[in-house]
Protein backbone atom coordinates (compact mmCIF):
# COMPACT_ATOMS: atom_id res chain seq x y z
CA UNK A 1 0.00 0.00 0.00
CA UNK A 2 2.90 2.37 0.69
CA UNK A 3 4.10 2.23 -2.91
CA UNK A 4 0.55 2.79 -4.16
CA UNK A 5 0.28 5.97 -2.10
CA UNK A 6 3.57 7.31 -3.48
CA UNK A 7 2.99 6.38 -7.10
CA UNK A 8 -0.62 7.54 -7.43
CA UNK A 9 -1.28 10.58 -5.29
CA UNK A 10 -4.97 11.40 -5.61
CA UNK A 11 -6.23 14.88 -6.38
CA UNK A 12 -7.29 16.75 -3.27
CA UNK A 13 -5.49 14.27 -1.04
CA UNK A 14 -3.58 15.01 2.13
CA UNK A 15 -0.74 12.60 2.96
CA UNK A 16 0.51 12.90 6.54
CA UNK A 17 3.83 11.31 7.51
CA UNK A 18 3.92 10.81 11.27
CA UNK A 19 7.28 10.18 12.93
CA UNK A 20 9.00 10.56 16.29
CA UNK A 21 12.46 11.01 17.73
CA UNK A 22 12.93 7.22 17.55
CA UNK A 23 12.38 7.04 13.78
CA UNK A 24 12.60 9.90 11.28
CA UNK A 25 10.07 10.12 8.45
CA UNK A 26 11.97 12.57 6.25
CA UNK A 27 13.21 9.69 4.10
CA UNK A 28 9.65 8.87 3.02
CA UNK A 29 9.08 12.60 2.49
CA UNK A 30 11.97 12.64 0.01
CA UNK A 31 10.53 9.58 -1.72
CA UNK A 32 7.19 11.39 -2.10
CA UNK A 33 8.96 14.36 -3.69
CA UNK A 34 10.89 12.07 -6.02
CA UNK A 35 7.73 10.22 -7.08
CA UNK A 36 5.87 13.48 -7.78
CA UNK A 37 8.74 14.80 -9.92
CA UNK A 38 8.79 11.58 -11.94
CA UNK A 39 5.06 12.09 -12.61
CA UNK A 40 6.06 15.43 -14.16
CA UNK A 41 4.33 17.44 -11.45
CA UNK A 42 5.45 20.77 -9.99
CA UNK A 43 6.51 20.41 -6.36
CA UNK A 44 6.63 23.30 -3.89
CA UNK A 45 8.52 22.58 -0.67
CA UNK A 46 8.09 24.76 2.42
CA UNK A 47 11.35 23.93 4.19
CA UNK A 48 11.21 25.13 7.79
CA UNK A 49 13.37 22.50 9.51
CA UNK A 50 16.00 21.30 7.03
CA UNK A 51 18.18 22.97 4.40
CA UNK A 52 17.52 22.46 0.71
CA UNK A 53 20.62 20.30 0.30
CA UNK A 54 19.32 17.76 2.81
CA UNK A 55 15.73 17.61 1.54
CA UNK A 56 16.72 17.41 -2.13
CA UNK A 57 19.68 15.05 -1.65
CA UNK A 58 19.63 12.19 -4.15
CA UNK A 59 16.88 13.64 -6.36
CA UNK A 60 17.32 13.56 -10.12
CA UNK A 61 18.82 16.87 -11.27
CA UNK A 62 16.88 16.67 -14.54
CA UNK A 63 13.72 17.61 -12.62
CA UNK A 64 15.27 20.71 -11.06
CA UNK A 65 12.94 23.06 -12.96
CA UNK A 66 9.91 21.31 -11.48
CA UNK A 67 11.14 21.60 -7.89
CA UNK A 68 10.53 24.90 -6.07
CA UNK A 69 12.13 25.13 -2.64
CA UNK A 70 10.92 28.00 -0.47
CA UNK A 71 13.60 28.57 2.12
CA UNK A 72 12.46 28.83 5.71
CA UNK A 73 15.55 27.30 7.31
CA UNK A 74 17.46 28.39 9.40
CA UNK A 75 15.22 31.40 10.12
CA UNK A 76 11.65 30.03 10.05
CA UNK A 77 10.26 32.90 12.13
CA UNK A 78 11.92 35.59 10.01
CA UNK A 79 13.73 37.27 12.90
CA UNK A 80 16.87 37.87 10.84
CA UNK A 81 15.15 38.40 7.50
CA UNK A 82 17.00 35.53 5.81
CA UNK A 83 14.00 33.40 4.86
CA UNK A 84 11.94 33.60 1.69
CA UNK A 85 8.92 32.10 3.49
CA UNK A 86 8.20 32.18 7.22
CA UNK A 87 5.87 30.33 9.56
CA UNK A 88 3.71 33.44 9.98
CA UNK A 89 2.98 33.33 6.24
CA UNK A 90 1.45 29.86 6.47
CA UNK A 91 -2.03 30.79 5.30
CA UNK A 92 -4.01 29.58 2.32
CA UNK A 93 -3.84 33.05 0.74
CA UNK A 94 -0.05 33.37 0.98
CA UNK A 95 0.61 29.82 -0.21
CA UNK A 96 -1.83 30.12 -3.12
CA UNK A 97 -0.17 33.33 -4.28
CA UNK A 98 3.27 31.77 -3.84
CA UNK A 99 2.36 28.89 -6.15
CA UNK A 100 0.64 31.10 -8.71
CA UNK A 101 3.73 33.30 -9.00
CA UNK A 102 5.65 30.31 -10.34
CA UNK A 103 3.05 30.00 -13.14
CA UNK A 104 2.58 26.22 -13.02
CA UNK A 105 0.98 24.50 -15.98
CA UNK A 106 -1.27 22.45 -13.68
CA UNK A 107 -2.05 21.90 -10.02
CA UNK A 108 1.07 21.43 -7.90
CA UNK A 109 2.14 19.23 -5.01
CA UNK A 110 2.70 21.08 -1.73
CA UNK A 111 5.24 19.63 0.72
CA UNK A 112 5.45 21.00 4.28
CA UNK A 113 8.61 20.21 6.26
CA UNK A 114 7.30 20.24 8.85
CA UNK A 115 3.80 20.85 10.19
CA UNK A 116 5.10 20.58 13.75
CA UNK A 117 6.86 23.93 13.53
CA UNK A 118 3.72 25.51 12.07
CA UNK A 119 1.49 24.05 14.81
CA UNK A 120 3.79 25.39 17.51
CA UNK A 121 3.23 28.98 16.34
CA UNK A 122 -0.35 28.82 15.04
CA UNK A 123 -3.70 27.76 16.39
CA UNK A 124 -4.25 24.12 15.29
CA UNK A 125 -7.78 24.97 14.16
CA UNK A 126 -6.47 27.76 11.90
CA UNK A 127 -3.81 25.43 10.46
CA UNK A 128 -6.43 22.77 9.67
CA UNK A 129 -8.68 25.38 8.05
CA UNK A 130 -5.79 26.56 5.87
CA UNK A 131 -4.98 22.99 4.82
CA UNK A 132 -8.62 22.32 3.97
CA UNK A 133 -8.85 25.53 1.91
CA UNK A 134 -5.70 24.58 0.00
CA UNK A 135 -7.12 21.13 -0.79
CA UNK A 136 -10.25 22.65 -2.31
CA UNK A 137 -8.69 25.74 -3.86
CA UNK A 138 -7.65 24.11 -7.14
CA UNK A 139 -4.06 25.35 -7.07
CA UNK A 140 -2.76 22.47 -4.93
CA UNK A 141 -3.33 18.90 -6.11
CA UNK A 142 -1.88 17.06 -3.12
CA UNK A 143 -0.53 18.11 0.28
CA UNK A 144 2.28 16.11 1.87
CA UNK A 145 3.16 17.02 5.44
CA UNK A 146 5.63 15.76 8.03
CA UNK A 147 4.45 15.72 11.65
CA UNK A 148 6.53 14.91 14.74
CA UNK A 149 3.83 13.26 16.85
CA UNK A 150 5.86 13.18 20.07
CA UNK A 151 6.02 17.00 20.17
CA UNK A 152 2.27 17.55 20.43
CA UNK A 153 -0.68 16.55 22.54
CA UNK A 154 -2.60 13.53 21.33
CA UNK A 155 -5.64 15.71 20.69
CA UNK A 156 -3.76 17.91 18.22
CA UNK A 157 -2.26 14.87 16.50
CA UNK A 158 -5.72 13.33 16.25
CA UNK A 159 -7.20 16.45 14.63
CA UNK A 160 -4.53 16.56 11.92
CA UNK A 161 -4.76 12.79 11.32
CA UNK A 162 -8.54 13.06 10.96
CA UNK A 163 -8.07 15.71 8.28
CA UNK A 164 -5.61 13.58 6.29
CA UNK A 165 -6.76 11.09 3.67
CA UNK A 166 -3.64 8.96 4.22
CA UNK A 167 -1.56 8.65 7.40
CA UNK A 168 1.86 6.98 7.30
CA UNK A 169 3.24 6.27 10.78
CA UNK A 170 6.87 5.14 10.95
CA UNK A 171 8.50 3.24 13.81
CA UNK A 172 11.91 1.61 14.36
CA UNK A 173 12.65 -2.12 14.25
CA UNK A 174 15.43 -4.33 15.58
CA UNK A 175 17.05 -4.19 12.14
CA UNK A 176 18.79 -0.86 11.55
CA UNK A 177 18.42 -1.22 7.78
CA UNK A 178 14.65 -1.29 7.91
CA UNK A 179 11.80 0.51 9.64
CA UNK A 180 8.12 -0.30 9.79
CA UNK A 181 5.41 1.90 8.28
CA UNK A 182 1.74 1.65 9.21
CA UNK A 183 -0.30 3.10 6.35
CA UNK A 184 -3.91 4.04 7.06
CA UNK A 185 -5.81 5.08 3.96
CA UNK A 186 -9.36 6.44 3.84
CA UNK A 187 -11.10 6.36 0.45
CA UNK A 188 -13.74 8.82 -0.74
CA UNK A 189 -16.44 6.22 -0.10
CA UNK A 190 -15.46 6.13 3.58
CA UNK A 191 -13.70 2.76 3.53
CA UNK A 192 -10.61 2.58 5.75
CA UNK A 193 -7.67 0.32 4.85
CA UNK A 194 -4.57 -0.29 6.95
CA UNK A 195 -1.36 -2.21 6.31
CA UNK A 196 2.02 -2.59 8.00
CA UNK A 197 5.15 -2.88 5.84
CA UNK A 198 8.91 -2.87 6.26
CA UNK A 199 10.67 -0.19 4.23
CA UNK A 200 14.07 1.28 3.52
CA UNK A 201 15.14 4.42 1.65
CA UNK A 202 18.21 4.47 -0.59
CA UNK A 203 20.47 7.45 -1.22
CA UNK A 204 18.71 8.25 -4.50
CA UNK A 205 15.32 8.54 -2.71
CA UNK A 206 14.12 5.14 -3.90
CA UNK A 207 11.73 3.32 -1.60
CA UNK A 208 12.00 -0.44 -1.04
CA UNK A 209 9.00 -2.10 0.60
CA UNK A 210 8.57 -5.57 2.05
CA UNK A 211 5.26 -6.88 3.37
CA UNK A 212 5.16 -7.61 7.08
CA UNK A 213 3.94 -11.15 7.92
CA UNK A 214 0.64 -11.18 9.74
CA UNK A 215 0.56 -12.26 13.37
CA UNK A 216 -2.21 -14.85 13.01
CA UNK A 217 -0.37 -16.52 10.12
CA UNK A 218 2.65 -17.10 12.33
CA UNK A 219 0.47 -18.44 15.14
CA UNK A 220 -1.20 -20.91 12.77
CA UNK A 221 2.17 -22.13 11.54
CA UNK A 222 3.37 -22.68 15.09
CA UNK A 223 0.22 -24.63 15.95
CA UNK A 224 0.50 -26.78 12.84
CA UNK A 225 4.16 -27.56 13.48
CA UNK A 226 3.73 -28.70 17.08
CA UNK A 227 0.27 -29.71 18.32
CA UNK A 228 0.26 -30.67 22.00
CA UNK A 229 -2.39 -32.81 23.69
CA UNK A 230 -3.56 -30.82 26.77
CA UNK A 231 -4.59 -34.02 28.61
CA UNK A 232 -1.31 -35.88 28.10
CA UNK A 233 0.47 -34.76 31.29
CA UNK A 234 -2.46 -34.76 33.75
CA UNK A 235 -2.34 -36.75 37.00
CA UNK A 236 -5.97 -37.86 36.60
CA UNK A 237 -7.95 -39.39 33.76
CA UNK A 238 -10.47 -37.25 31.90
CA UNK A 239 -11.85 -40.14 29.84
CA UNK A 240 -14.21 -42.95 30.98
CA UNK A 241 -13.85 -46.57 30.06
CA UNK A 242 -16.84 -48.55 28.72
CA UNK A 243 -17.41 -50.25 32.08
CA UNK A 244 -17.29 -46.95 33.95
CA UNK A 245 -19.74 -45.42 31.49
CA UNK A 246 -22.29 -48.27 32.03
CA UNK A 247 -21.98 -47.94 35.81
CA UNK A 248 -22.56 -44.21 35.55
CA UNK A 249 -25.76 -44.70 33.56
CA UNK A 250 -27.20 -47.08 36.20
CA UNK A 251 -26.81 -44.63 39.07
CA UNK A 252 -30.17 -43.11 40.12
CA UNK A 253 -29.83 -39.40 40.55
CA UNK A 254 -31.57 -37.87 43.61
CA UNK A 255 -33.25 -35.06 41.71
CA UNK A 256 -34.96 -37.32 39.14
CA UNK A 257 -38.69 -37.78 39.97
CA UNK A 258 -39.41 -41.27 38.63
CA UNK A 259 -42.85 -42.69 37.83
CA UNK A 260 -42.61 -45.09 40.77
CA UNK A 261 -42.08 -42.30 43.27
CA UNK A 262 -44.93 -40.33 41.75
CA UNK A 263 -47.39 -43.26 41.99
CA UNK A 264 -46.40 -43.99 45.56
CA UNK A 265 -47.08 -40.44 46.63
CA UNK A 266 -50.50 -40.29 44.95
CA UNK A 267 -51.76 -43.71 46.16
CA UNK A 268 -54.12 -43.32 49.18
CA UNK A 269 -53.10 -45.13 52.35
CA UNK A 270 -55.36 -46.47 55.18
CA UNK A 271 -55.99 -44.02 57.94
CA UNK A 272 -55.19 -40.98 55.88
CA UNK A 273 -57.46 -37.97 56.16
CA UNK A 274 -59.70 -36.67 53.38
CA UNK A 275 -61.25 -33.30 52.73
CA UNK A 276 -64.91 -33.41 51.74
CA UNK A 277 -66.22 -30.30 50.04
CA UNK A 278 -69.58 -29.60 48.47
CA UNK A 279 -69.72 -26.49 46.32
CA UNK A 280 -72.25 -23.89 47.35
CA UNK A 281 -74.47 -21.94 44.96
CA UNK A 282 -72.77 -18.67 45.89
CA UNK A 283 -69.25 -19.96 45.30
CA UNK A 284 -67.19 -18.14 42.68
CA UNK A 285 -66.48 -20.83 40.11
CA UNK A 286 -63.93 -20.22 37.39
CA UNK A 287 -64.21 -22.46 34.37
CA UNK A 288 -60.59 -21.77 33.54
CA UNK A 289 -59.02 -23.13 36.67
CA UNK A 290 -55.30 -22.22 36.68
CA UNK A 291 -54.60 -25.30 38.83
CA UNK A 292 -56.52 -27.68 36.60
CA UNK A 293 -53.34 -29.10 35.11
CA UNK A 294 -51.95 -30.12 38.50
CA UNK A 295 -51.93 -33.87 39.09
CA UNK A 296 -53.22 -33.97 42.68
Curated annotation (Swiss-Prot):
Taken from the record, one Pfam family name reads Elong_Iki1
* Annotated GO CC locations: cytoplasm; cytosol; elongator holoenzyme complex; nucleus
Q: Which domain of life is it from?
A: Eukaryota
CDD domains under this entry?
A: Elp5
Pathway(s) served: tRNA modification; 5-methoxycarbonylmethyl-2-thiouridine-tRNA biosynthesis
Q: Which UniProt keywords apply?
A: Cytoplasm, Nucleus, tRNA processing
Biological process terms from the Gene Ontology for this record are: positive regulation of cell migration; tRNA modification; tRNA wobble uridine modification
**Region ranges (Disordered):** 203-232, 264-296
Subcellular location as annotated: Nucleus; Cytoplasm
Biased-composition ranges, Basic and acidic residues, are 214-224
Q: Could you tell me where the Acidic residues compositional bias lies?
A: 280-296
Name the residue ranges with Polar residues bias. Answer: 203-212
Q: Which InterPro entries match?
A: Elp5, P-loop_NTPase
Which family would the database say this protein is a member of? Belongs to the ELP5 family.
* Quaternary data: Component of the elongator complex.
PANTHER family for the chain: ELONGATOR COMPLEX PROTEIN 5
Protein purpose: Component of the elongator complex which is required for multiple tRNA modifications, including mcm5U (5-methoxycarbonylmethyl uridine), mcm5s2U (5-methoxycarbonylmethyl-2-thiouridine), and ncm5U (5-carbamoylmethyl uridine). The elongator complex catalyzes the formation of carboxymethyluridine in the wobble base at position 34 in tRNAs.
* Name listed for the protein in its UniProt record: Elongator complex protein 5
Q: Which organism is it from?
A: Danio rerio
The gene designation is elp5
Amino acid sequence: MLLEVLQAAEAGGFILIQDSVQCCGRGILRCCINAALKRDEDVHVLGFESPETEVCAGLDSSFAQKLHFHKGFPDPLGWRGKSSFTVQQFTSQHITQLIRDSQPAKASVLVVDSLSLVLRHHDPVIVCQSLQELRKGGVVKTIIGLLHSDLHLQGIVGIVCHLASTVISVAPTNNERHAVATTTRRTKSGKVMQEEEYFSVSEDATLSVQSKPRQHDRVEKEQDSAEVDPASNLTFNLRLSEEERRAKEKVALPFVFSQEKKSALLRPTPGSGRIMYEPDANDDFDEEDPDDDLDV
